[in-house]
Amino acid sequence: MHPRFENAFRQLPASLQAALRPLIDKPDFAAMLTADDVNAVCEASQLDADALAFALLPLAAACAQAPISNFQVGAIAQGLSGNFYFGANMEFSAVQLQQTVHAEQSAVSHAWMRNERGLRAVTVNYTPCGHCRQFMNELRDAASLRIQLPGRQPATLSHYLPDSFGPVDLQIDTLLMDDINHGATLQNMNALARQALDAANRSHAPYSKAISGIVLETSSGNTYTGRYAENAAFNPSLPPLQTALNLMNLAGEDLSTVKHAVVVERRNAVVSHWAISQIMLAELGCTDVEHHFIEE
């Protein structure tokens, strides 16, 4: 078991500990449960799926990286597939607060990066801020998405974001988590550039058209890709670097172990992630960063 989970795990009921331990003890446990895992744990612990999501919140919050606020937020995204995806807030020292990943963004993008096609509920240990409500409003399932908070009845996202502004107001019909391939290409690709290109091609960037992807390679040899997730309100958009760092953190790898990165984006796009990605990666100790432009 990753050390970050130990304290929260000890607080769980014995029946839930027994059901979860074989899963969470796996060296490759990456902060998600498959639908089969969820069903097995629910049966063994006598919890339904929603109750299990609440019970898992302390484990999700244990994944938080909050060096500025010291405020740990956890979230569980329940996929239409039945899978559970952990999420936690991530803060980055020495760069703007705007680079923060909120727990709901973390859980939603975690599901997206694992190719989940929709969400039925997001369970979180604190009320979602307006930024997160707007971020989730980009989802195909936004109208029916349930938000579940401790001590409150479940309510739809529209309850927490009435009279919302979203993709429909900008005549956008391709939404976050839709299956998409932009079909862009690169010349002279190596294996890492190919992964970053694939991420760019699956980006959600209907407003700027500035598709972008990134791949991070760690000292252990693992790779993590990130896609750009744009938002109708612009500011809640999630850059590809954060999407990749989120996956890396949830997998339990130290962010300081990134040794190489590849950024792929459009040349002369109205939005570029190159400069801020360089700055943030340098703060994490990685200065070996490649920049590739998509063939137009």
Curated annotation (Swiss-Prot):
<keyword id="KW-0479">Metal-binding</keyword>
<dbReference type="Pfam" id="PF00383">
    <property type="entry name" value="dCMP_cyt_deam_1"/>
</dbReference>
<dbReference type="InterPro" id="IPR016193">
    <property type="entry name" value="Cytidine_deaminase-like"/>
</dbReference>
<dbReference type="GO" id="GO:0009972">
    <property type="term" value="P:cytidine deamination"/>
</dbReference>
<dbReference type="GO" id="GO:0004126">
    <property type="term" value="F:cytidine deaminase activity"/>
</dbReference>
<dbReference type="InterPro" id="IPR020797">
    <property type="entry name" value="Cytidine_deaminase_bacteria"/>
</dbReference>
<feature type="domain" description="CMP/dCMP-type deaminase 1">
    <location>
        <begin position="48"/>
        <end position="168"/>
    </location>
</feature>
<comment type="subunit">
    <text>Homodimer.</text>
</comment>
<dbReference type="Pfam" id="PF08211">
    <property type="entry name" value="dCMP_cyt_deam_2"/>
</dbReference>
<dbReference type="InterPro" id="IPR006263">
    <property type="entry name" value="Cyt_deam_dimer"/>
</dbReference>
<dbReference type="GO" id="GO:0008270">
    <property type="term" value="F:zinc ion binding"/>
</dbReference>
<keyword id="KW-0378">Hydrolase</keyword>
<feature type="active site" description="Proton donor">
    <location>
        <position position="104"/>
    </location>
</feature>
<protein>
    <recommendedName>
        <fullName>Cytidine deaminase</fullName>
        <ecNumber>3.5.4.5</ecNumber>
    </recommendedName>
</protein>
<feature type="domain" description="CMP/dCMP-type deaminase 2">
    <location>
        <begin position="187"/>
        <end position="296"/>
    </location>
</feature>
<dbReference type="InterPro" id="IPR002125">
    <property type="entry name" value="CMP_dCMP_dom"/>
</dbReference>
<feature type="binding site">
    <location>
        <position position="102"/>
    </location>
    <ligand>
        <name>Zn(2+)</name>
    </ligand>
</feature>
<comment type="similarity">
    <text>Belongs to the cytidine and deoxycytidylate deaminase family.</text>
</comment>
<dbReference type="InterPro" id="IPR013171">
    <property type="entry name" value="Cyd/dCyd_deaminase_Zn-bd"/>
</dbReference>
<dbReference type="GO" id="GO:0042802">
    <property type="term" value="F:identical protein binding"/>
</dbReference>
<feature type="binding site">
    <location>
        <begin position="89"/>
        <end position="91"/>
    </location>
    <ligand>
        <name>substrate</name>
    </ligand>
</feature>
<feature type="binding site">
    <location>
        <position position="132"/>
    </location>
    <ligand>
        <name>Zn(2+)</name>
    </ligand>
</feature>
<dbReference type="GO" id="GO:0005829">
    <property type="term" value="C:cytosol"/>
</dbReference>
<comment type="function">
    <text>This enzyme scavenges exogenous and endogenous cytidine and 2'-deoxycytidine for UMP synthesis.</text>
</comment>
<feature type="binding site">
    <location>
        <position position="129"/>
    </location>
    <ligand>
        <name>Zn(2+)</name>
    </ligand>
</feature>
<dbReference type="InterPro" id="IPR016192">
    <property type="entry name" value="APOBEC/CMP_deaminase_Zn-bd"/>
</dbReference>
<dbReference type="InterPro" id="IPR050202">
    <property type="entry name" value="Cyt/Deoxycyt_deaminase"/>
</dbReference>
<keyword id="KW-0862">Zinc</keyword>
